[in-house]
């Protein structure tokens, strides 16, 4: 079975695989059909955006473990997803490098033993720059990440630290901790993928080369660890491992994430949707780089919060934010 979002793309695929025993499905109905396939025990959620919410809920209700590579699902609907997963007895296994590192560092320890989650960030390509130096940043500059090779949107998000803001929100739901227990640490070498500090002062971290194959494989085969060829971390080659505080004044997209999560309700959805729209406009060269956090802040300031939004209200909030930014006429 294969799913394509548009009917046109599905028709094209059907013609290409006509001589194969492959069923081609389309749209949200297609995603939902794939999500609950009885043959599968684990659903890898790797779609981009809030389109992942409904299939993830359907898979959980069908008793499937979730390998989660879609931040938006927990950012916007964590209050729905995590209680449902607990009720159904299914595991939410993080695929994100940082959240996988935290998951591995926790190793089943009770929540009460966690003092702090240390969420690492590379700092992106503009680490150390002032807001004045960021005024004339072009799309090409922002698409050069120092350590990771990723898609266009997430690379821009990493440069603004909004990606780290989304990861803070995701960590709050995944690990059931208070927002103030999540500390972002800039670690330019991306060797320590994240860590957990316990109530006795011990810090347990997961280290490795910057390679997404490890967290992906770990989520797919959990609780097993399997042989994986590839470059190993050589401590003798590590010239230095450094840490800094994030600059939340220059890169205030990260601060806005903490603000949105503290407010709660539908505000994290506003943060996420406004960023998606703003990044799209920047990639289309319709707004300046520094307008990305400005648009997020403006969208948050004009929003009337809905407490405990259901899925329909989450999607309506997303649409209203898109409409608000469209109305600015960029």
What do the PLM-derived regions correspond to, one by one?
Residues 1-330:
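Catalytic, metal-anchored helix/loop core of enzyme active sites in primary metabolism
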């Amino acid at each position: 079975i294969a799913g394509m979002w548009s009917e046109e793309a599905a028709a094209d695929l059907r013609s290409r695989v006509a001589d194969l025993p492959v069923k081609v499905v389309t749209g949200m109905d297609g995603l939902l059909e794939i999500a609950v396939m009885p043959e599968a025990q684990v659903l890898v959620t790797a779609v981009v955006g809030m389109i992942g919410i409904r299939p993830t809920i359907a898979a959980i209700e069908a008793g499937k473990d979730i390998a989660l590579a879609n931040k938006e699902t927990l950012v916007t609907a964590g209050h729905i997803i995590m209680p449902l997963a607990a009720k159904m007895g299914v595991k939410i296994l993080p695929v994100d490098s940082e959240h996988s590192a935290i998951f591995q560092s926790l190793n089943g320890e009770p929540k009460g033993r966690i003092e702090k989650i240390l969420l690492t960030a590379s700092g992106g390509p503009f680490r150390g720059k002032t807001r004045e130096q960021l005024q004339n940043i072009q799309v090409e500059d922002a698409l050069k990440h120092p350590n990771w090779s990723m898609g266009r949107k997430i690379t821009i998000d990493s440069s603004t630290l909004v990606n780290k803001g989304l990861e803070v929100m995701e960590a709050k739901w995944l690990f059931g901790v208070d927002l103030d227990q999540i500390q972002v640490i800039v670690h330019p070498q991306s060797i320590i993928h994240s860590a957990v500090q316990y109530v006795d002062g011990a810090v347990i971290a997961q280290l490795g080369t910057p390679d997404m194959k490890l967290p992906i494989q770990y989520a797919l085969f959990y609780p097993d660890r399997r042989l994986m060829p590839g470059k190993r971390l050589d401590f003798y080659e590590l010239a230095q491992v450094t840490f800094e505080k994030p600059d939340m004044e220059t890169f205030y997209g990260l601060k806005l994430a903490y603000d949105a999560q503290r407010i709660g309700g539908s505000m994290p959805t506003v943060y996420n949707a406004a960023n998606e729209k703003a990044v799209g406009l920047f990639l289309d060269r319709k707004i300046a780089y520094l307008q990305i956090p400005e648009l997020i802040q403006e969208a948050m300031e004009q929003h009337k919060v809905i407490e405990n939004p259901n899925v329909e209200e989450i999607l309506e909030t997303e649409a209203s934010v898109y409409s608000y930014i469209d109305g600015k006429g960029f």
